[in-house]
A protein has these predicted regions:
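Coiled-coil termination/hinge junctions
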Residues: 8-30
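A short beta-strand-turn-helix
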Residues: 33-54
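Thiol/disulfide oxidoreductase modules built on the thioredoxin-like
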Residues: 108, 117-164
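Conserved redox-active cysteine motifs that mediate thiol-disulfide chemistry
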Residues: 52, 58-75
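Hydrophobic beta-strand anchors of alpha/beta hydrolase catalytic cores
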Residues: 55-56, 87
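Short, small-residue-biased leader/transition segments that mark boundaries at the very start
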Residues: 2-7
Length: 168
């Protein structure tokens, strides 16, 4: 049937994306420019190499699963920041206002960035094969990607497992 053909094509595309994502581990990160809450331009490379591991948390104010994960991510940050972890959140929100409201509400103690144009968002999501959010990119001190894909769930201990392995 036509529906099953569409499903098969979609499934094949998803599989290809998953394969490419798994191949991203070991690659050098790709730099992108974002904006801060105060509208300053900041590059991803400004954050890479400052700590043993940088978690880039990709989210948006309208994303339910993203918001549900934030309290767990805050706990992970508290537990690991002295062991070499830093976090930066990148929002793909269209609305500056909604983004800032969400940032105020969740009080994340790390830097908040946003893709400041549709082109930047598309380029960032394309370079990192972001098909949905929450998405996570984890970069080591040398700028090598150690993980890229669906957010490792702090709520389920997935993120902690990777951090325990990499921050020995």
């Amino acid at each position: 049937s036509a529906a099953s053909d569409v499903y098969k094509r979609q499934h094949k595309r998803d599989q290809e994306r998953m394969n490419k994502l798994s191949q991203m581990s070991g690659e050098t990160f790709k730099n992108h420019i974002f904006e801060t809450l105060s509208k300053k331009r900041k590059e991803l490379r400004n954050y890479v190499g400052k700590s043993k591991l940088l978690v880039v948390d990709v989210w948006a104010s309208w994303c339910g699963p993203c918001k549900k994960e934030i309290p767990h991510l805050k706990k992970v940050y508290d537990d690991y920041k002295d062991k070499g972890l830093s976090i930066v959140s990148v929002s793909i929100d269209d609305s500056d206002k909604k983004w800032k409201e969400a940032v105020d509400k969740f009080e994340m103690p790390w830097e908040q960035l946003r893709t400041s144009s549709n082109e930047e968002m598309k380029s960032f999501m394309g370079d990192y094969l972001i098909g949905g959010i929450p998405h996570m990119i984890i970069i080591d001190k040398e700028g090598i990607i150690v993980y890229a894909g669906s957010a490792l769930r702090a709520e389920k201990g997935q993120l902690q497992n990777l951090l325990n392995e990499k921050l020995k």
